[in-house]
Each structure stands twice: as structure tokens, then as C-alpha cells.
From Swiss-Prot:
Organism listed in the record: Solibacter usitatus (strain Ellin6076)
Entry's Gene Ontology BP terms: regulation of DNA-templated transcription
Primary location: cytoplasm
GO MF annotation: an example: DNA binding
Protein's name according to its UniProt entry: Probable transcriptional regulatory protein Acid_5948
């Protein structure tokens, strides 16, 4: 298990136990609104279906979900939200992708660049690090909700191609084209899922330790706490014990 995967597990715990739950609401409302631009029916819109499921997992009221969908379809007025991907490097040279949803691109560019420079990194040009990642369907399942053999059979039959034990969760990976079929297969078998998404998964990992490791985690948290940031991806790898100590 890579340090980056372990960090994803730690983030899920933090989101469920502290004030960051409010930030999760904000992010998911934006995601639902953006996804609904391609249709308000989740049965015909896999991205919207995944966003609604993630929203229900954090107990978002159904009225909030409905209004976010209506803003996306144009039935309700709302600010124009633009999706932008920023690229850069963190401490130790780790590659970083920052996915944002903003109503003011110029403001967000300035603030994200400042976050990089203030925390030992630097923002790069478009295409500078994206090639180090690949688009993958990523679905998490609580470890106690299914056995490896049970999951493997369901996932492989539905088009999934990788299953990883991340400690407290199973990480199910597949080609983006199989995302919806894998998600539906898990649901139809009564297996609860967490944060189903199409993610940027690093092709190779970069080992970090000491000041570079602590600096990278600080940069990651600063970026994730920004109001416009939807998700942050990186190829860092930190020893599990060091990562747990730094995350206390």
C-alpha cells in the first residue's frame, strides 16, 4: 500500500469526524451542479449518479441535492461555475494536480499559485505533470463490508481490473468506461461504497521523507482547504508509519 493511498484513507476519516464535513457539502454541491449540465436524470448520467451517492454518504439533505441538480439543468438560477485543472510540483518534486470549480478563474489562479509558493512548491504550465497520471475509476468500500474474494468476483465480472487493500478500505480501480457498471454491480450486491469518482491516479510514485514529506502534506491540506478546490492528486509516497505520525 502506497503512502498516497493511505493518505486517501486518512482523509476519509478526517472528513467524517471534523469540521471538514461542511467543506464536503460545498464540494459535492458544485460537483452535482456541474454533472447535471449533462442531464438531470442520474440513471442516464453516471457522473451525476456518483455525485448523488457521495452526497448521500455524508448525509446531505435531499432538498440540497435537488436544488443543485436544478441549478445544473438551468431550472434554478446560479452563478456560472467553471472547471479548471492546475498542475504543479510540491516539496521534493512530487507532481500535483488540483481540480477546481470556480466562478472567478483569475482570483482562483492567483490564490492557488500563492498556496504552492508559500508551501514549498510551484505551479507549472498546463501539461507539465498531467502525463504522470492516468484517468481511472476509483471506488472505495469499507473493509468490513466485503471479503476480498467476494469483491474480486463482483468487480472483475463488471469490468474492474484492480483491487487494493488500503487498510480500512478496499480501493476498486477500473477503466473509466467501466465505472458505472462496477458501481451498479456493487450496489446490486448490497455493498456500500464511498466516494465513487473518476480520479487521476499516478503511474509511478515518488518517495518522500523528512521535511519534504511534512511539507508535501502541508501543501496538500492547504490546497484541499481552499473553497474552490474539488480534489487534489499527487504521486507522493510516504512511509506508512511516518505518514500516520505526521497526520496526528
Amino acid at each position: 500500500m502506497s503512502g498516497h493511498s493511505k493518505w486517501a484513507t486518512i482523509k476519509h476519516k478526517k472528513a467524517a469526524t471534523d469540521a471538514k464535513r461542511g467543506r464536503a457539502f460545498t464540494r459535492l454541491i458544485k460537483e452535482i451542479t456541474i454533472a447535471a449540465r449533462n442531464g438531470g436524470d442520474p440513471d442516464g448520467n453516471p457522473r451525476l449518479r456518483s455525485a448523488i451517492l457521495a452526497a448521500k454518504n455524508v448525509s446531505m439533505p435531499s432538498d440540497n441535492i435537488k436544488k443543485a441538480i436544478m441549478r445544473g439543468t438551468g431550472e434554478l438560477e446560479g452563478g456560472q461555475i467553471e472547471e479548471v485543472m492546475f498542475e504543479g510540483y510540491g516539496p521534493g518534486g512530487a507532481a500535483v494536480l488540483v481540480n477546481v470549480a470556480t466562478d472567478n478563474r483569475n482570483r482562483t489562479v492567483s490564490e492557488i499559485r500563492h498556496a504552492f509558493s508559500k508551501n514549498g512548491g510551484n505551479m507549472g504550465e498546463q501539461g507539465s505533470v498531467a502525463w504522470m497520471f492516468e484517468r481511472r475509476s476509483q471506488i472505495f468500500v469499507p473493509i468490513e463490508k466485503a471479503t476480498e474474494d467476494q469483491l474480486m468476483g463482483i468487480v472483475l465480472d463488471a469490468g474492474g481490473d484492480d483491487l487494493r487493500n488500503d487498510g480500512d478500505q478496499w480501493e476498486v480501480l477500473s477503466d473509466p468506461a467501466s465505472h458505472d457498471s462496477v458501481l451498479k454491480a456493487l450496489e446490486s450486491n448490497g455493498i456500500p461504497v464511498v466516494d465513487p469518482t473518476i480520479a487521476w491516479v499516478p503511474k509511478n510514485l515518488m518517495k518522500l521523507e523528512g521535511k519534504n514529506a511534512s511539507g508535501m502534506l502541508r501543501l496538500t491540506e492547504v490546497l484541499e482547504d481552499h473553497d474552490d478546490v474539488q480534489s487534489v492528486y499527487s504521486n507522493f509516497d510516504i512511509d506508512e508509519k511516518e505518514l500516520e505520525a505526521l497526520s496526528q
